[in-house]
UniProtKB/Swiss-Prot annotation:
Pathway: Lipid metabolism; sphingolipid metabolism. It is a multi-pass membrane protein. Component of the serine palmitoyltransferase (SPT) complex, which is composed of SPTLC1, SPTLC2 or SPTLC3 and SPTSSA or SPTSSB. The heterodimer consisting of SPTLC1 and SPTLC2/SPTLC3 forms the catalytic core of the enzyme, while SPTSSA or SPTSSB subunits determine substrate specificity. SPT also interacts with ORMDL proteins, especially ORMDL3, which negatively regulate SPT activity in the presence of ceramides. It comes from the Eukaryota. InterPro entries: Ser_palmitoyltrfase_ssu-like, SPT_small_subunit. The chain crosses the membrane at residues 22-38, 44-66. This is Serine palmitoyltransferase small subunit A.
Length: 80
């Protein structure tokens, strides 16, 4: 008879499954970007710069995109 961890400990909670999935996604991020080769302080600097750049891009898009879209709609006379 085969006994699994779920038989002994009961069903895994959704929080545990979510945590494992997030850990797997972070591991994939480290592998795809080759950050696993960096020292922890280098990884922190890289991630900080990445978050800053993405944050600035999202903020700029949020502030300026409505104006540009409205200008395009006026140009093509979709909106008067």
């Amino acid at each position: 008879m085969k006994v699994s961890c779920e038989d002994i400990n009961g069903p895994r909670s959704s929080l545990s499954r979510a945590w494992n999935h997030m850990s797997w996604l972070y591991y994939q991020y480290l592998l795809v970007t080759a950050l696993y080769m960096l020292e922890p302080w280098e990884r922190t600097i890289f991630n900080s710069m990445l978050v800053s750049i993405v944050g600035m891009a999202l903020y700029t898009g949020y502030i300026f995109m409505p104006q540009h879209i409205l200008a395009i709609l006026h140009y093509f006379e979709i909106v008067q």
